[in-house]
């Protein structure tokens, strides 16, 4: 059997769609059906065809995932908006019970992420993700019905379970459609939804909290509206999100073949490889994997501090309950814009480490500035510091997730590593939930200092990983007598990872 692709040419490459010429000029085995191993001469693919394919993915997949993550972030953090409307007082919270309520979410969030991640490989991310969305939408609705601290604790526990594997699932799902060099900006668009959710949540809360005279409190209406819309969107996503490139009804047969070849060439040797639990755990043997996990934890503190406490940080400047939510909109939107900027720069430079350091430094400076000035006498500077805080917090999370996915081409290992790394970042919400103590309100100076310190630790870890990768790549070049980059590594060598002497790190 011989399979040809009409969209093959020797067109010139641009910076967005550079293909690995040395890889595409080789004899590439492609599995076009059961029992049929075909070897075909594949040259540089038509870059216009690839751009059209990516554009289809961008318009048919990314908006759905962004919508999913928007409500994922919204339903997780809407309690911070509800608190500004007196939720904690209405439910009879005393002492540090609000902090405990924030903390309880992260325990099942971390415990369930790893086992739940296997559902994606077993049943497909396109089916499991909407199920989780239905679940956390239902929990958001339940928050409107709780009457006391115990009830809210129970709901937040199940909300943590429902949201635990959403982010790893989305990252894994995107790696089955996009090349490594295309991933950061797409993940950035997806992650930007979390920033947009903060802005959207602030605007919605601003409007809802103006409702007077109803049978429910404003914060209860907020939970009902957000939970109800989440539930409806989950049904739409289940019906529309493609299971894989092979089943995407918006692709032609030629585009499906092209899409499969792209990922086979850029990722592990087979897209549909079976999940091996024992093999997947070998990803943690390399010291770099441990450093990445520590990096995720360090950078998780600034990210969760922003997600959980931005309304309270803004409220410290003296704004009213209603206006506080409105004033969180601009920093959140700015964070989404900077997230895209950092991601596009990273993809353009083909470098994660340098851009990561720039993003983390920006956020760290924001926390330091806010904590070191008299905020009531310098409202403008304090508010500007909020923009700095949000500028790099989400970007650092995006680039870190992309970084280790870029360097973990084996599909099973990638799924497992993501399901561990992302929850570790989120479990640091336990830290952010407990360093913002009631006795330190309204400015929370100790919490701001601790958050900045974790940012500094993150910078040290990123720098250490980058330096190791640079010199390890040089060592491999010297041993083989040839200079290579990650783009020069053939497909068959990618799955083995660093154990293969031909492997090169994506810096």
Swiss-Prot record:
Native source organism of the sequence: Schizosaccharomyces pombe (strain 972 / ATCC 24843)
Keywords in alphabetical order: Endoplasmic reticulum, Membrane, Transmembrane, Transmembrane helix, Transport
Any one annotated GO CC term: membrane
Record's bilayer topology term: Multi-pass membrane protein
Protein name: Uncharacterized transporter C1039.04
Region ranges (Disordered): 1-20
Entry-linked InterPro entries: MFS, MFS_dom, MFS_trans_sf
Transmembrane regions: 57-74, 100-120, 126-146, 157-177, 189-209, 221-241, 283-303, 326-346, 353-373, 379-399, 416-436, 445-465
GO biological process, one term: carboxylic acid transmembrane transport
A GO molecular-function descriptor: transmembrane transporter activity
Subcellular location field: Endoplasmic reticulum; Membrane
């Amino acid at each position: 059997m011989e399979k040809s692709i009409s969209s093959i040419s020797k067109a010139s490459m641009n910076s967005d769609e550079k293909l690995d010429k040395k890889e595409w000029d080789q004899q590439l085995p492609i599995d076009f059906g059961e029992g049929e191993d075909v070897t075909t001469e594949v040259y540089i693919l038509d870059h216009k065809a690839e751009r059209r394919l990516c554009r289809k993915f961008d318009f048919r997949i990314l908006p759905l995932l962004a919508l999913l993550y928007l409500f994922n972030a919204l339903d997780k953090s809407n309690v911070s908006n509800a608190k500004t409307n007196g939720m904690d007082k209405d439910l009879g919270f005393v002492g540090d019970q609000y902090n405990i309520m924030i903390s309880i979410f992260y325990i099942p969030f971390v415990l369930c992420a790893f086992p739940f991640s296997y559902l994606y490989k077993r049943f497909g991310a396109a089916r499991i993700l909407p199920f989780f969305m239905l679940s956390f939408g239902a929990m958001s609705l339940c928050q409107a019905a709780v009457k006391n601290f115990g009830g809210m604790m129970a709901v937040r526990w199940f909300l943590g379970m429902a949201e635990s594997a959403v982010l790893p699932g989305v990252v894994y799902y995107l790696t089955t459609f996009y090349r490594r060099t295309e991933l950061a900006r797409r993940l950035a668009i997806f992650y930007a939804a979390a920033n947009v959710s903060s802005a959207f949540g602030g605007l919605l809360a601003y409007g809802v909290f103006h409702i007077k005279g109803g049978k429910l409190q404003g914060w209860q209406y907020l939970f009902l509206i957000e939970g109800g819309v989440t539930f409806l969107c989950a049904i739409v996503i289940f019906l529309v999100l493609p299971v894989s490139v092979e089943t995407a009804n918006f692709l032609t047969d030629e585009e499906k073949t092209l899409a499969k070849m792209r990922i086979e060439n850029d990722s592990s040797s087979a897209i549909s490889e079976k999940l091996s639990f024992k093999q997947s755990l070998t990803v943690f043997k390399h010291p770099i994997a441990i450093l990445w996990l520590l990096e995720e934890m360090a950078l998780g503190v600034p990210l969760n501090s922003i997600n959980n406490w931005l309304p309270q940080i803004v409220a410290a400047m003296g704004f009213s309950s209603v206006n506080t939510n409105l004033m969180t909109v601009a920093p959140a939107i700015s964070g989404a814009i900077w997230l895209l900027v950092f991601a596009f720069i990273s993809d353009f430079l083909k470098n994660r480490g340098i851009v990561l350091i720039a993003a983390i430094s920006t956020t760290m400076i924001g926390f330091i500035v806010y904590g070191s000035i008299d905020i009531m006498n310098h409202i403008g500077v304090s508010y500007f510091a909020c923009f700095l805080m949000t500028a790099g917090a989400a970007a650092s999370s995006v680039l870190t997730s992309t970084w280790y996915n870029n360097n973990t081409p084996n599909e099973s290992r990638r799924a497992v590593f993501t399901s561990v790394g992302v929850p570790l970042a989120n479990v640091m919400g336990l830290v952010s939930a407990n360093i913002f103590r009631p006795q330190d309100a309204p400015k929370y100076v100790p919490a701001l200092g601790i958050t900045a310190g974790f940012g500094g630790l993150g910078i040290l870890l990123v720098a250490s990983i980058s330096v190791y990768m640079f010199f390890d790549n040089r060592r491999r070049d010297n041993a083989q007598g040839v200079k290579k980059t990650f783009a020069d590594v053939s497909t068959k060598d990618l799955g083995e990872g660093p154990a293969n002497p031909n492997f090169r790190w994506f810096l």
